[in-house]
Curated annotation (Swiss-Prot):
Cited Pfam families: RrnaAD
Reaction equations catalysed: adenosine(1518)/adenosine(1519) in 16S rRNA + 4 S-adenosyl-L-methionine = N(6)-dimethyladenosine(1518)/N(6)-dimethyladenosine(1519) in 16S rRNA + 4 S-adenosyl-L-homocysteine + 4 H(+)
Keywords: Cytoplasm, Methyltransferase, RNA-binding, rRNA processing, S-adenosyl-L-methionine, Transferase
Transmembrane segments: none
UniProt key word Aminoacyl-tRNA synthetase: no
PANTHER family xref list: DIMETHYLADENOSINE TRANSFERASE (PTHR11727), DIMETHYLADENOSINE TRANSFERASE-RELATED (PTHR11727:SF7)
Enzyme class: transferase
HAMAP family given in the database record: 16SrRNA_methyltr_A
Chief place of localization: cytoplasm
Family membership noted in the UniProt record: Belongs to the class I-like SAM-binding methyltransferase superfamily. rRNA adenine N(6)-methyltransferase family. RsmA subfamily.
Name of this chain's protein: Ribosomal RNA small subunit methyltransferase A
Species in which this protein is naturally found: Citrobacter koseri (strain ATCC BAA-895 / CDC 4225-83 / SGSC4696)
NCBIfam families in UniProt: ksgA
Residues holding S-adenosyl-L-methionine: N18, L20, G45, E66, D91, N113
Length: 273
Protein backbone atom coordinates (compact mmCIF):
# COMPACT_ATOMS: atom_id res chain seq x y z
CA UNK A 1 0.00 0.00 0.00
CA UNK A 2 1.24 3.48 -0.86
CA UNK A 3 1.66 5.31 2.45
CA UNK A 4 1.44 8.64 0.61
CA UNK A 5 -2.25 7.98 -0.13
CA UNK A 6 -4.75 9.12 2.51
CA UNK A 7 -8.54 9.23 2.00
CA UNK A 8 -7.96 8.63 -1.70
CA UNK A 9 -5.62 11.61 -2.10
CA UNK A 10 -1.96 11.18 -3.04
CA UNK A 11 0.16 13.46 -0.84
CA UNK A 12 2.19 15.76 -3.08
CA UNK A 13 5.84 16.20 -2.14
CA UNK A 14 6.09 19.55 -3.92
CA UNK A 15 3.39 20.94 -1.60
CA UNK A 16 5.02 19.37 1.47
CA UNK A 17 1.81 17.47 2.26
CA UNK A 18 1.58 15.32 5.41
CA UNK A 19 -1.98 14.65 6.57
CA UNK A 20 -2.87 14.61 10.26
CA UNK A 21 -4.83 11.48 11.26
CA UNK A 22 -4.42 11.04 15.04
CA UNK A 23 -7.77 11.86 16.71
CA UNK A 24 -6.25 12.60 20.13
CA UNK A 25 -3.83 15.10 18.58
CA UNK A 26 -6.62 16.64 16.47
CA UNK A 27 -8.86 17.05 19.55
CA UNK A 28 -5.97 18.59 21.52
CA UNK A 29 -5.25 21.14 18.77
CA UNK A 30 -8.92 22.11 18.38
CA UNK A 31 -9.19 22.49 22.15
CA UNK A 32 -6.13 24.77 22.15
CA UNK A 33 -7.56 26.88 19.32
CA UNK A 34 -10.98 27.03 21.03
CA UNK A 35 -12.91 28.43 18.03
CA UNK A 36 -16.11 30.34 18.78
CA UNK A 37 -19.06 31.30 16.57
CA UNK A 38 -18.74 34.81 15.17
CA UNK A 39 -14.93 34.78 15.15
CA UNK A 40 -13.00 35.30 11.90
CA UNK A 41 -11.37 31.86 11.71
CA UNK A 42 -8.95 31.31 8.82
CA UNK A 43 -7.26 27.97 8.08
CA UNK A 44 -4.12 27.76 5.97
CA UNK A 45 -3.69 24.44 4.15
CA UNK A 46 -6.82 22.54 5.25
CA UNK A 47 -5.74 19.47 3.26
CA UNK A 48 -8.17 16.60 3.91
CA UNK A 49 -10.04 18.60 6.57
CA UNK A 50 -8.61 16.88 9.69
CA UNK A 51 -8.81 20.21 11.55
CA UNK A 52 -11.37 21.86 9.25
CA UNK A 53 -14.17 19.44 10.21
CA UNK A 54 -13.96 19.71 14.03
CA UNK A 55 -13.35 23.48 13.86
CA UNK A 56 -16.11 23.93 11.26
CA UNK A 57 -18.58 22.03 13.46
CA UNK A 58 -18.32 24.85 16.00
CA UNK A 59 -18.74 27.68 13.47
CA UNK A 60 -21.23 29.12 11.01
CA UNK A 61 -18.50 30.38 8.67
CA UNK A 62 -14.87 29.44 8.04
CA UNK A 63 -12.33 30.83 5.57
CA UNK A 64 -9.76 28.40 4.14
CA UNK A 65 -6.71 28.95 1.93
CA UNK A 66 -5.70 25.87 -0.08
CA UNK A 67 -3.14 25.83 -2.91
CA UNK A 68 -3.89 22.27 -4.08
CA UNK A 69 -6.65 22.48 -6.71
CA UNK A 70 -7.93 18.93 -6.03
CA UNK A 71 -8.17 19.48 -2.27
CA UNK A 72 -9.93 22.83 -2.74
CA UNK A 73 -12.49 21.08 -4.99
CA UNK A 74 -13.06 18.36 -2.36
CA UNK A 75 -13.77 21.01 0.26
CA UNK A 76 -16.23 22.79 -2.02
CA UNK A 77 -18.36 19.63 -2.25
CA UNK A 78 -17.92 18.58 1.41
CA UNK A 79 -21.31 17.29 2.68
CA UNK A 80 -21.66 19.53 5.75
CA UNK A 81 -18.69 21.93 5.55
CA UNK A 82 -19.21 23.12 1.97
CA UNK A 83 -21.89 25.77 2.68
CA UNK A 84 -19.89 27.18 5.61
CA UNK A 85 -16.64 27.62 3.71
CA UNK A 86 -15.16 30.58 1.88
CA UNK A 87 -12.37 28.96 -0.16
CA UNK A 88 -9.36 30.80 -1.56
CA UNK A 89 -7.55 28.46 -3.96
CA UNK A 90 -4.17 30.20 -3.82
CA UNK A 91 -0.76 30.27 -2.17
CA UNK A 92 -0.99 31.70 1.37
CA UNK A 93 2.25 33.57 0.61
CA UNK A 94 0.28 35.75 -1.84
CA UNK A 95 -2.64 36.36 0.52
CA UNK A 96 -3.27 39.89 1.78
CA UNK A 97 -4.42 39.13 5.32
CA UNK A 98 -5.01 42.84 6.01
CA UNK A 99 -7.57 43.04 3.20
CA UNK A 100 -9.15 39.77 4.36
CA UNK A 101 -9.55 41.13 7.90
CA UNK A 102 -11.15 44.32 6.55
CA UNK A 103 -13.52 42.27 4.40
CA UNK A 104 -14.64 40.11 7.34
CA UNK A 105 -14.73 43.12 9.66
CA UNK A 106 -12.58 41.88 12.55
CA UNK A 107 -9.09 40.59 13.40
CA UNK A 108 -8.33 37.10 12.10
CA UNK A 109 -7.72 33.92 14.10
CA UNK A 110 -5.36 31.98 11.83
CA UNK A 111 -4.54 28.29 12.20
CA UNK A 112 -3.21 25.36 10.22
CA UNK A 113 -0.95 22.37 9.78
CA UNK A 114 1.61 24.30 7.73
CA UNK A 115 3.62 22.65 4.94
CA UNK A 116 7.09 22.41 6.44
CA UNK A 117 8.79 23.46 3.21
CA UNK A 118 7.29 26.97 3.42
CA UNK A 119 6.66 27.41 7.14
CA UNK A 120 9.46 29.92 7.87
CA UNK A 121 8.83 32.30 4.93
CA UNK A 122 5.09 32.05 5.63
CA UNK A 123 5.67 33.08 9.26
CA UNK A 124 7.53 36.20 8.08
CA UNK A 125 4.69 36.95 5.64
CA UNK A 126 2.14 36.69 8.47
CA UNK A 127 4.23 38.86 10.80
CA UNK A 128 3.73 41.76 8.37
CA UNK A 129 -0.03 41.50 9.03
CA UNK A 130 -0.06 41.23 12.83
CA UNK A 131 -2.22 44.38 13.08
CA UNK A 132 -4.96 42.34 11.37
CA UNK A 133 -4.45 39.11 13.36
CA UNK A 134 -5.79 38.25 16.84
CA UNK A 135 -3.82 35.01 17.22
CA UNK A 136 -2.26 32.11 15.31
CA UNK A 137 -2.05 28.37 16.04
CA UNK A 138 0.25 26.32 13.83
CA UNK A 139 1.55 22.80 13.55
CA UNK A 140 5.20 23.14 12.58
CA UNK A 141 8.40 21.16 12.51
CA UNK A 142 9.46 20.90 16.18
CA UNK A 143 12.83 22.43 15.32
CA UNK A 144 11.04 25.55 13.98
CA UNK A 145 8.96 25.85 17.16
CA UNK A 146 12.17 25.55 19.20
CA UNK A 147 13.61 28.44 17.17
CA UNK A 148 10.46 30.54 17.63
CA UNK A 149 10.57 30.25 21.44
CA UNK A 150 14.38 30.28 21.92
CA UNK A 151 16.05 32.92 24.06
CA UNK A 152 19.56 34.39 23.80
CA UNK A 153 22.63 32.24 24.45
CA UNK A 154 21.15 29.14 22.83
CA UNK A 155 21.89 27.46 19.49
CA UNK A 156 18.23 27.61 18.45
CA UNK A 157 18.12 31.40 18.92
CA UNK A 158 18.28 33.21 15.60
CA UNK A 159 16.66 35.78 13.36
CA UNK A 160 13.32 33.92 13.44
CA UNK A 161 13.36 34.02 17.27
CA UNK A 162 14.02 37.76 17.36
CA UNK A 163 11.43 38.71 14.73
CA UNK A 164 8.74 36.36 16.11
CA UNK A 165 9.20 37.64 19.67
CA UNK A 166 9.28 41.25 18.45
CA UNK A 167 5.81 40.78 16.93
CA UNK A 168 4.21 38.15 19.18
CA UNK A 169 4.02 36.33 22.46
CA UNK A 170 5.12 32.79 21.52
CA UNK A 171 3.68 29.86 23.49
CA UNK A 172 4.46 26.16 22.79
CA UNK A 173 1.25 24.08 23.02
CA UNK A 174 2.06 20.38 22.40
CA UNK A 175 4.49 18.02 20.68
CA UNK A 176 3.33 15.64 17.95
CA UNK A 177 5.10 12.42 16.81
CA UNK A 178 5.56 11.44 13.13
CA UNK A 179 3.06 8.58 13.61
CA UNK A 180 0.22 11.13 13.81
CA UNK A 181 0.56 11.78 10.06
CA UNK A 182 0.14 10.07 6.69
CA UNK A 183 2.76 9.81 5.30
CA UNK A 184 4.83 10.11 8.50
CA UNK A 185 7.32 12.99 8.20
CA UNK A 186 10.97 12.31 9.03
CA UNK A 187 10.88 14.87 11.87
CA UNK A 188 8.94 15.54 15.07
CA UNK A 189 6.28 18.24 14.99
CA UNK A 190 4.86 20.67 17.53
CA UNK A 191 1.97 23.10 17.86
CA UNK A 192 2.64 26.72 18.78
CA UNK A 193 0.41 29.66 19.67
CA UNK A 194 1.46 33.16 18.55
CA UNK A 195 -0.40 36.15 19.97
CA UNK A 196 0.51 39.52 18.41
CA UNK A 197 1.42 42.11 21.05
CA UNK A 198 -1.33 44.69 21.59
CA UNK A 199 1.34 47.01 22.98
CA UNK A 200 4.81 46.42 21.56
CA UNK A 201 7.25 45.67 24.44
CA UNK A 202 10.16 47.02 22.36
CA UNK A 203 8.81 49.59 19.85
CA UNK A 204 10.92 49.99 16.71
CA UNK A 205 10.86 53.08 14.51
CA UNK A 206 11.54 51.18 11.26
CA UNK A 207 11.02 47.42 11.08
CA UNK A 208 13.18 47.25 7.93
CA UNK A 209 16.18 48.37 9.99
CA UNK A 210 15.59 45.63 12.60
CA UNK A 211 15.25 43.12 9.76
CA UNK A 212 18.53 44.26 8.22
CA UNK A 213 20.47 44.17 11.50
CA UNK A 214 19.25 40.68 12.43
CA UNK A 215 19.93 39.37 8.92
CA UNK A 216 23.51 40.67 8.91
CA UNK A 217 24.21 39.53 12.47
CA UNK A 218 22.86 35.99 12.11
CA UNK A 219 24.29 35.45 8.62
CA UNK A 220 27.67 35.62 10.39
CA UNK A 221 26.59 34.28 13.75
CA UNK A 222 30.05 32.96 14.72
CA UNK A 223 31.59 36.42 14.37
CA UNK A 224 31.51 39.01 17.13
CA UNK A 225 29.12 41.87 16.41
CA UNK A 226 32.02 44.33 16.16
CA UNK A 227 32.83 42.40 12.95
CA UNK A 228 29.44 41.21 11.69
CA UNK A 229 27.83 44.63 12.25
CA UNK A 230 31.00 46.70 11.84
CA UNK A 231 29.60 48.39 8.73
CA UNK A 232 26.66 49.70 10.79
CA UNK A 233 28.01 50.38 14.30
CA UNK A 234 31.34 51.56 15.66
CA UNK A 235 32.75 49.98 18.82
CA UNK A 236 32.10 53.31 20.58
CA UNK A 237 28.42 53.31 19.63
CA UNK A 238 27.91 49.71 20.76
CA UNK A 239 29.60 50.53 24.06
CA UNK A 240 27.46 53.67 24.40
CA UNK A 241 24.36 51.49 23.91
CA UNK A 242 25.56 49.19 26.68
CA UNK A 243 26.21 46.31 24.28
CA UNK A 244 29.52 44.44 24.48
CA UNK A 245 31.13 44.47 20.99
CA UNK A 246 32.72 41.09 21.78
CA UNK A 247 29.31 39.36 21.92
CA UNK A 248 27.99 37.22 19.06
CA UNK A 249 24.58 37.46 17.40
CA UNK A 250 23.12 34.72 19.61
CA UNK A 251 24.07 36.63 22.79
CA UNK A 252 22.04 39.76 21.97
CA UNK A 253 18.49 40.02 23.38
CA UNK A 254 15.40 41.08 21.43
CA UNK A 255 15.35 44.34 23.43
CA UNK A 256 18.99 45.05 22.48
CA UNK A 257 18.36 44.37 18.78
CA UNK A 258 15.44 46.82 18.92
CA UNK A 259 17.63 49.36 20.72
CA UNK A 260 20.25 49.03 17.96
CA UNK A 261 17.60 49.38 15.26
CA UNK A 262 16.26 52.59 16.80
CA UNK A 263 19.75 54.05 17.08
CA UNK A 264 20.40 53.28 13.42
CA UNK A 265 17.04 54.78 12.39
CA UNK A 266 18.01 58.05 14.09
CA UNK A 267 21.68 58.18 13.10
CA UNK A 268 23.63 57.64 9.91
CA UNK A 269 25.79 54.47 10.04
CA UNK A 270 29.10 55.30 11.66
CA UNK A 271 32.41 53.44 11.60
CA UNK A 272 35.38 53.54 13.91
CA UNK A 273 38.01 55.75 12.38
Amino acid sequence: MNNRVHQGHLARKRFGQNFLNDQFVIDSIVSAINPQKGQAMVEIGPGLAALTEPVGERLDQLTVIELDRDLAARLQTHPFLGPKLTIYQQDAMTMNFGELSEKIGQPLRVFGNLPYNISTPLMFHLFSYTDAIADMHFMLQKEVVNRLVAGPNSKAYGRLSVMAQYYCQVIPVLEVPPSAFTPPPKVDSAVVRLVPHTTMPYPVKDIRVLSRITTEAFNQRRKTIRNSLGNLFSVEVLTELGIDPALRAENISVAQYCQMANYLSENAPSKES
